[in-house]
Amino acid sequence: SKSSIETPPSYNQLNYNENLQRFFNSKPVTAPVETDPIKMEQSYSTPANTGSNLSPMQCFEDSGGSGSSRNCTSGSNLNMGSVTNTSNTGTGTSSGSAPLVTLTESLLK
């Protein structure tokens, strides 16, 4: 016996499969997939004083076994360049790490 507090399914929830079928039957026009790799624009300034602003890779390489730790504490300014995705078809993934997959009816089943 179900609780009377539960919300009954809505019309859209009951007809989810029918809505999907109707969507794919309508042959929707989708944006063409770009064959160019995602254009990446690096936007960061190179610090003049590299003694206190080290890249995360430099901190990682210097931290192992040598006994001398450069200014790599969590409070130091790490030079982490921010990468901006300038492509309007990007999915937020980095360039080439995940292939773009076109949504098809078979993927939803």
Curated annotation (Swiss-Prot):
Subcellular location: Nucleus; Cytoplasm, Perinuclear region
Post-translational modifications reported in the UniProt record: Phosphorylated with a circadian rhythmicity, probably by the double-time protein (dbt). Phosphorylation could be implicated in the stability of per monomer and in the formation of heterodimer per-tim.
Biased composition (Low complexity): 81-97
Predominant cellular place of this UniProt entry's protein: nucleus
Claim: Repeat is one of the keywords in the record: yes
One GO term describing the cellular component: nucleus
Biased composition (Polar residues): 42-56, 68-80
Keywords for the protein's UniProt record, in alphabetical order: Biological rhythms, Cytoplasm, Nucleus, Phosphoprotein, Repeat
Top-level taxon in the UniProt lineage: Eukaryota
Residue ranges, annotated region (Disordered): 42-109
Gene Ontology terms: biological process: rhythmic process
Disulfide bridge partners, by residue number: none
Keyword presence, Repeat: yes
Reported function: Essential for biological clock functions. Determines the period length of circadian and ultradian rhythms; an increase in PER dosage leads to shortened circadian rhythms and a decrease leads to lengthened circadian rhythms. Essential for the circadian rhythmicity of locomotor activity, eclosion behavior, and for the rhythmic component of the male courtship song that originates in the thoracic nervous system. The biological cycle depends on the rhythmic formation and nuclear localization of the TIM-PER complex. Light induces the degradation of TIM, which promotes elimination of PER.
Subunit and interaction comment: Forms a heterodimer with timeless (TIM); the complex then translocates into the nucleus.
The protein, known as: Period circadian protein
